[in-house]
Amino acid sequence: MIKLKVKKGDEVIVVTGKYKGKKGKVLKVFIDENTVIVSGVNLVKKHTKPNKMSEGGIITKESPIHISNVAHIDPKTGNPTKVAFKFLEDGSKVRIAKKSGEIIGKVGNDVKI
């Protein structure tokens, strides 16, 4: 199992495939399948039947993409970057961009022991 460094709400860029170079926000992360749904990327058309609640028709929606095909966007430069983990002086664990050293986001309430 791959260690997931991508979280919901992160800004990512697609690095391979049909949507290469397209940027978007992570909408959902599927931990078991190592996939993410990125807004505006990997669009598929789904045919739905009409029922009591909604009309039928063709719906365009995002489909999951493997996490190896996306990379974080460096907050400083706007280019793709790898992610590292670092502990701050107050003991909180954060994700940082390897290229610029900028903080991408906090990991949680983890405390260094």
Swiss-Prot record:
Keywords: Ribonucleoprotein, Ribosomal protein, RNA-binding, rRNA-binding. SUPFAM superfamilies: Translation proteins SH3-like domain. GO terms for cellular component: ribonucleoprotein complex; ribosome. It holds the Pfam family KOW. GO terms for molecular function: rRNA binding; structural constituent of ribosome. Belongs to the universal ribosomal protein uL24 family. One of two assembly initiator proteins, it binds directly to the 5'-end of the 23S rRNA, where it nucleates assembly of the 50S subunit. One of the proteins that surrounds the polypeptide exit tunnel on the outside of the subunit. Part of the 50S ribosomal subunit. This is Large ribosomal subunit protein uL24. It comes from Rickettsia typhi (strain ATCC VR-144 / Wilmington).
